[in-house]
Amino acid sequence: MTNVGEQLKKKPMLRGGGFTFKQFFVAHDRCAMKVGTDGVLLGAWVPVEKARKVLDIGCGSGLIALMIAQRSTPEVMIDGVELEPEAAQQASSNAAQSPWAERVHIYQQDVHQFAENHLHQYDLIVSNPPYFAPAVACRDEARDTARYTGSLTHDALLNCAEKLITEDGIFCVVLPHDLGEELSRLAVQQNWFIRCQVDIRDRPGKPLHRILLTLSRQAGETEFQQLDLRQSEGVYSPEFCALISDFYLNY
């Protein structure tokens, strides 16, 4: 006879108001920006093997921090900093209800103040940063803060990362492709080195639309990669499936 309890343990129950992953749930109904492919890409891709202390700048719902917690060893500690109060509270709640409650800590604070006052440095910093210029006012103030660069320009983001990163640390971001190239140029001007660049498109023949970057203060060759999220017929590519298989249900 099938044990229903064992079935429930193996397959997470779907819940509303958020996104159910294999090992955790991310509530995002109080966050301006919801769980999306950008955050999932960064959380699944970022190198965690050498990380011991991690910072997620603009952590939103806490998605990326929780993905890194799942992928990393138990001694790795992860901090998230988030300006918007509702999002920070929800990220704290998501972390508290996850299997890694003791390892993930959320700070509701402006990252500029955080960078000035925080005593710790991080060997891995990640960010899914804002990317719209505030030329047109957004109808939702929280969403405006989450996705417009008015509160965190790329120049300011790099400056904050410089203050918070260890000498050998890496800084990883995901952005729309054109803005990622702009950030790359700005980073080089500020004496960062591009150590890895992943150009992303939806499927073969489509234009590049996202970019993953690894920046470092240490010189080294740049590794260039390309990722198609889907195959020509529209199904997820084997490469993308390999990234998400530990997280997405049914993969």
Swiss-Prot record:
It is found in: Cytoplasm. PROSITE patterns: N6_MTASE. GO terms for molecular function: nucleic acid binding; tRNA (adenine-N6)-methyltransferase activity. Its main location: cytoplasm. InterPro entries: DNA_methylase_N6_adenine_CS (IPR002052), SAM-dependent_MTases_sf (IPR029063), Small_mtfrase_dom (IPR007848), tRNA_Adenine-N(6)_MTase (IPR050210), tRNA_adenine-N6_MeTrfase (IPR022882). GO terms for biological process: methylation; tRNA processing. GO terms for cellular component: cytoplasm. CDD domains: AdoMet_MTases. It catalyses: adenosine(37) in tRNA1(Val) + S-adenosyl-L-methionine = N(6)-methyladenosine(37) in tRNA1(Val) + S-adenosyl-L-homocysteine + H(+). Belongs to the methyltransferase superfamily. tRNA (adenine-N(6)-)-methyltransferase family. This is tRNA1(Val) (adenine(37)-N6)-methyltransferase.
